[in-house]
């Protein structure tokens, strides 16, 4: 399967994976902040955006999607790039790390760390509401996307500052969600529980929006227990999709996450990238 992607910038390659129901343009706000220091590869996941339909073919859906992403890395000749993702994309980045295909992993509110199954049912219900709402407002979506109130109605569940979405981006994201509905239904058929071990020499960063209303911040505690060697950070004031809520903060997290030293490197090399302001406080 050939996936749709954009490739910009220069530096070490950083693959960016969006969440379920989203598209590669999820990363638009952080691109100008990173492109001078990273080669950025933003990809539409199978069944999303401009990529071909998702066909798991009897495989477990999330694992099937991870296999497609790894095959995509092979197509581009990327042996062990830095990999980062949001939500489902964060889970896929972690799977890549567990399979030795990522130099570093950064997960922004990654899926797979439920406190209990009810949290999955809650998230699934939100997606169902979004699906029904999207189907019901298709004719009026352009008008809603142009208004601050309309963007709040459409995106309050996934961003904390919907007014920061442009009308064009809001409309595109609404249309992308409807395109991805078959893939969303497959992914949400059963909960993903991330339990795969990641070698300690693979630097991992987990960052969670403190105002995440979809994958609740309590799941960050599960991630901390599951991945004790990772760096765990809050994203103050950010919702589930933090890239537009605070692109400066997210860019710093991505930059730092893809420059963390391995345990074999001297401690003196563990410095933030030159242009990055102070790192967010660990928690």
Language model region names:
Residues 63-81:
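Conserved acidic catalytic loop of the alpha/beta-hydrolase fold
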Residues 102-138:
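Flexible "cap/lid" loop of the alpha/beta hydrolase fold
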Residues 6-54:
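Conserved HGGG/HGGXW glycine-rich cap/lid loop of the alpha/beta-hydrolase fold
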Residues 229-283:
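Catalytic active-site module of serine/aspartate enzymes centered on a nucleophile-bearing elbow/loop
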Residues 141-198:
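Conserved alpha/beta-hydrolase catalytic His-Asp/Glu region
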Residues 44, 82, 104-106:
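Residue in the alpha/beta-hydrolase core beta-strand immediately N-terminal to the catalytic nucleophile
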Residues 85, 89, 93:
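Gly/Ala-rich beta-loop-alpha elbow adjacent to hydrolase catalytic centers
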Residues 179-225, 234:
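Conserved serine/cysteine hydrolase catalytic core
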């Amino acid at each position: 399967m050939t996936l749709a992607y954009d490739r910009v910038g220069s530096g070490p390659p950083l693959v960016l994976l969006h969440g379920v129901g989203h598209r590669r343009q999820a990363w638009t706000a952080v691109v100008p902040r990173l492109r001078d220091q990273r080669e950025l590869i933003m990809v539409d996941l199978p069944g999303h955006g401009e990529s071909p339909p998702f066909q798991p073919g009897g495989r477990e859906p999330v694992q099937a999607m991870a296999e497609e992403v790894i095959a995509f890395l092979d197509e581009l000749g990327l042996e062990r790039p830095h990999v980062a993702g949001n939500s489902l994309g964060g889970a896929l980045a972690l799977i890549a790390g567990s399979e030795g295909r990522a130099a570093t992993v950064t997960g922004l509110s990654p899926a797979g760390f439920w406190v209990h199954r009810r949290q999955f049912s809650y998230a699934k219900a939100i997606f169902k509401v979004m699906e029904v709402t999207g189907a019901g407002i298709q004719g009026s979506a352009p008008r809603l996307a142009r208004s601050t109130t309309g963007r709040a109605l459409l995106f309050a569940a996934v961003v904390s500052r919907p007014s920061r979405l442009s009308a064009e981006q809001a409309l595109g994201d609404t249309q992308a969600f409807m395109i991805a509905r078959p893939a969303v239904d497959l992914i949400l058929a059963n909960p993903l529980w991330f339990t795969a071990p990641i070698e300690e020499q693979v630097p991992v960063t987990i960052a969670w929006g403190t105002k995440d209303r979809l994958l609740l911040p309590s799941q960050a505690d599960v991630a901390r227990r599951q991945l004790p060697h990772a760096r765990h950070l809050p994203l103050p004031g950010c919702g589930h999709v933090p890239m537009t809520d605070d692109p400066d903060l997210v860019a710093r997290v991505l930059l730092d996450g893809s420059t963390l030293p391995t345990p074999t490197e001297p401690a003196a090399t563990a410095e933030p990238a030159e242009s990055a302001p102070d790192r967010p406080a660990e928690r």
